[in-house]
Design a protein with these regions (language model features):
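Conserved aromatic-histidine-acidic binding/catalytic patches
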Residues: 5-13, 140-144, 197, 211
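Donor-binding and catalytic core of enzymes assembling or modifying cell-surface/extracellular glycoconjugates
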Residues: 11, 158-233, 240-242, 247
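Secretory-pathway luminal glycosyltransferase catalytic domains
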Residues: 43-163
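Structural motif
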Residues: 2, 124-125, 167, 211
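Gly/Pro- and small hydrophobic-enriched strand-loop and loop-to-helix capping segments
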Residues: 26-37, 226-255
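N-terminal pre-catalytic "stem/leader" segment of glycosyltransferase-like enzymes
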Residues: 1-39
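Short, solvent-exposed loop/turn segments at secondary-structure junctions
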Residues: 10-12, 39-44, 84-88, 130-135, ...
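Short beta-strand segments
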Residues: 35-40, 128, 167-172
Length: 255
């Protein structure tokens, strides 16, 4: 019997949804196959904003997850639908998920250059600054809000107290804002030159860092988790209304 997972949102959201499906497949033996329903993306274009919504596409092809598993669920099928943004949703298959989320992407020379720079540092720290659609999309802004300079200042101060000579790698689509607001020695700002296929360059590079200052974004959550982050700092207020903070692991620091 097939178990269907309804995919929605961007890459980080799809990763949570897929993980919940893998977990359910293990938990309920009556299901033998996991299928991905990507009908949410029909007629959408990547990064096109229309009527207050950001267009999305099926993104799990950046890993070794076959597109052959994408199939619209027939009427009457068992369907998992939700966001599942909590480690408890797939803790029973976490090792399997780490293996399945192996990148199947040919990264650019620029991305490989930054990767080499990360490996050359004793204490490479990833900082993710999510602005973009959180600013220009009214729905995203009212739902997520935007992390301001104060959050990053406090987080950097904490990292500096924990590590000797950390080197910060800032990943963002808003390079100008980062240049004006992220002030610390030993800083490399990584912008669109390392986006690569479906923006995976930033996620891949974040997984190579030792510790992480994440945004209120599932994208950077995965950067920290897949990177086995030594020290992760995240926002106490994940969504603008104050909900959603249970996405943070118990061992992560909230600011």
């Amino acid at each position: 019997m097939n178990l269907y997972v309804y995919l929605q949102g961007g890459l980080g959201n799809q990763m949570f949804q897929y993980s919940a499906g893998v977990s359910a497949l293990k938990e309920y033996p009556q299901f033998t196959n996991l299928k991905l329903d990507a009908s949410f993306y029909e007629g959408q274009e990547v990064k096109v904003v229309k009527d207050g919504h950001t267009g999305r596409n099926y993104d799990l092809d950046v890993f070794n997850i076959s597109y052959a598993d994408v199939e619209e669920a027939p009427e009457g099928s068992t369907m998992l639908e939700g966001w599942f943004q909590n480690i408890k949703e797939f803790e029973n298959v976490s090792d399997k998920i780490r293996k399945e989320f192996t990148f199947n992407v040919d990264f650019s020379e620029q991305t490989k250059k930054i990767e080499d720079e990360i490996y050359s540092k004793v204490n490479p720290i990833a900082i993710h600054v999510r602005r973009g659609d959180y600013i220009y999309n009214p729905n995203c802004f009212s739902y997520h809000g935007v992390l301001e300079k104060e959050y990053y200042d406090k987080s950097i101060k904490m990292i500096n107290s924990h590590y000797d000579n950390p080197h910060f790698f800032v990943f963002s689509e808003d390079v100008d804002w980062c240049k004006q607001n992220i002030k610390t020695p030993n800083l490399t700002i990584v912008g669109s030159e390392c986006n690569d296929y479906k923006d995976t360059g930033h996620l891949y590079l974040m997984t190579k860092c030792k510790s992480h200052i994440i945004a209120n974004s599932s994208f950077s959550w995965w950067g920290a988790w897949l990177g086995n982050s030594e020290l992760t700092i995240g926002p106490k207020k994940w969504k603008r209304d104050g909900t959603g903070s249970d996405i943070m692991l118990d061992t992560w620091i909230k600011i």
